[in-house]
């Protein structure tokens, strides 16, 4: 069954409480302070000093725990935010209103000979903020983001200027995204911001990158379980562990030292640092 907000048969139902995908601030002030766990749960910090690990905020003993298997992860995740995060027995189900869905995977193998493995998180997004590049067309972006052409056409009728150089990225470089082949279509002006509803998943590769809407093959993610999660060189997140529903704007992960993190993440471009206050004001104005 194809979801109304996606042209892909693999799209999963949304609750309506999903965040908008944006590169900022996660790819700027949060790039070296927030990992995949923080990003998926929406717990932004611009000064976190240690890697966030499920259960660590509650001082749960690791007991030689490795992230090559899923053992013990559910207990640790639920302990971090009791009453605000719930394990979903059916990963295909819709999250309840006010909640959004995340998925956890682990890496039994990697290219480094690492014996402890690693975890990785993905989060369902409800809309996208994207900056056009040379060659973009209405039809091409519709295929890339798995939406109807009318959705892109409507967004193209109300484009805006990017607020920062990185505003509108969906990968480290938008030109590296694997784009579906299309015939010549309606050309779009490069360097403009489009905002439109979508049903895709995003993730963040630890402290090494900003948020991504693409998998290891450069393709946008409709269902993380069907995406390429084998990074080379890197970890191979081949084992699906569980899906969770997360109360939006109510959770914290790891050693979150940013007092405004939970509030700010609900409007992702409101960067919570002094030198970005002007950017935040512009974003608020652009949404009116």
Predicted regions and their residues:
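...with weaker cross-activation on analogous glycine-rich loops/strands in unrelated enzymes
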Residues: 63-128, 190, 195-208
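Extracytoplasmic/periplasmic, Sec-exported soluble proteins
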Residues: 28-32, 114, 133, 144-147
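Small/polar beta-strand repeat architecture
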Residues: 164-196
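Cysteine-nucleophile protease catalytic domains, especially the papain-like/related folds used
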Residues: 2-84
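Primarily a LysM-type cell-wall glycan-binding module
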Residues: 128-159, 167-178
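Ubiquitin-like/PB1-type beta-grasp interaction modules and other compact soluble beta-rich domains
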Residues: 14, 25-35, 96-106, 222, ...
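Secretory-pathway/luminal and periplasmic proteins that interact with or process carbohydrate-rich
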Residues: 118-121, 161-166
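Active-site or metal-binding loop neighborhoods of secreted/extracellular toxin and effector enzymes
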Residues: 187-288
